[in-house]
Amino acid sequence: VLEEQIKISLSNIKEFEMSSIKNKVIIAYEPIWAIGTGKVATNKNIEEVHSFIKHLLKDDFKIGLDIPIIYGGSVNEDNSLDIFKIKNVDGVLVGGASLKPNSFLKIISNSL
């Protein structure tokens, strides 16, 4: 499903345009079961999926290493530091925790 979603999303971009999107596109991976549930994927799962996306972009679209891939899925101040340490995670997509200023500031601090 994920592979199909990415391929469909990028299918209308011409080959010569691919190099110019690297500064304009960010891909966010958020497991559907994690949306608003408080459940977070395991670090291993996050790394595997992000690695899969990077390789797909590199092999099929020749842009894999240039497109940031961020993780979303119940990111909060308690788990963000560990998420930032995962290979191939270029950042996080913060939902509910962004509504709590102190929590959001801690997530930002964890990213540094």
Where are these predicted regions, by residue range?
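Active-site rim beta-loop-alpha module in soluble metabolic enzymes
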Residues: V1-G64
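Short alpha-helical interface patches
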Residues: M18-S20, N88, I107-S111
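Hydrophobic faces of well-ordered beta-strands that scaffold small-molecule active sites
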Residues: V25-Y29, L65-G73, D90-V94
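Active-site-proximal loop/turn and secondary-structure-junction residues that shape catalytic pockets
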Residues: P31-W33, V75-E77, S98
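Residues that form or flank phosphate/diphosphate-binding pockets in enzymes
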Residues: G36, D78-N79, N102
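Short, glycine/charged-enriched secondary-structure capping and boundary segments
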Residues: A41-K44, I83-I86, K106-S109
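Catalytic cores of alpha/beta
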Residues: V75-V89
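C-terminal helical cap(s) of enzyme catalytic domains, especially alpha/beta-barrels
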Residues: S98-L112
